[in-house]
Amino acid sequence: MQSEDGDVAPTIDVSVPHPARRYDYWLGGKDNFAADRESGDAIAAQFPGIRTAVVENRRLLRRAVTQLAAEQGIRQFLDIGTGLPTASNTHEVAQLIAPEARIVYVDNDPLVLTHARALLTSSAEGRTAYVDADVRDPDNILHSREVADTLDLNQPVALMLLAVMHFVTDDEDPYGIVKRLVTALPPGSCLVLSHATADWMPPETAAMIQSGKHGAGRLRGRDEVARFFDGLELIEPGVVPLAEWRSEATPPPAAEVAMYAGVARRPS
């Protein structure tokens, strides 16, 4: 099957759970299949806080993008692992502050691609684009036509890696991937990263979530998450439990969310 622009549309494998569709299920969306729901329910049975975690991750996105656009003057965003469109997507938050903001979304689920083309529409002053790619191949993202046509890599870019790097296992070089992406961006660019952790989980829960059938490739501790920001200048409050990052209200307990988050700037 071909899309309107002539690209061949990849096939959706509904028998295998996909993180973007499972995330949609936890958020109460309808763009998911039986395999996604089965996997999502299995994880929720062991870790009931998962729905709180995904809601808090979306709230973090809003806070971080607002901070970067309003306080750091960022006008370009590269959002990798964007997931299915929902309320307060990156471009919507950024363009409320700066209508001229430009955003490139990246994901590797064909269903996300279909919805992104239809729903992730920019303001008249700005621009959005979508890249069908995997974070594990950063050069494919950086050298894509969409990035070249949408972003000026001579000007600061916010790299958004929300709830994605825990799907990259140690043998897939997660730190090298992030370093490759960050070093391709100019000084003044920022990294926004959230990451699941087992720091507050019983060992059996962590083992199930990290299993090949259901989960994250690697839950990492705080020091391991902080390592993604090596060489960057952390913005206050640093690497903290996700819901506590510049929280606007009393956050849920760290153990209920079981994620860390941080925002950092590439120095001049």
Positions of the model-derived regions?
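Conserved beta-strand signature within the Rossmann-like core of class I S-adenosyl-L-methionine
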Residues: 157-161, 184-195
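A short glycine-rich, Lys/Arg-flanked "PGG" loop and its adjoining helix->strand segment in the class I
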Residues: 175-187
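Rossmann-like AdoMet
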Residues: 1-133, 137-150, 258
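Short alpha-helix
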Residues: 216-239
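Short, glycine-/aromatic-enriched active-site segment of Class I SAM-dependent methyltransferases
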Residues: 198-214
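A short SAM/SAH-binding and catalytic strip from SAM-dependent methyltransferases
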Residues: 135-136, 145-175
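Core SAM-dependent methyltransferase catalytic element
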Residues: 238, 243-268
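Short "lid" loop at the C-terminus of a central beta-strand within the Rossmann-like core
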Residues: 164-167, 196-200
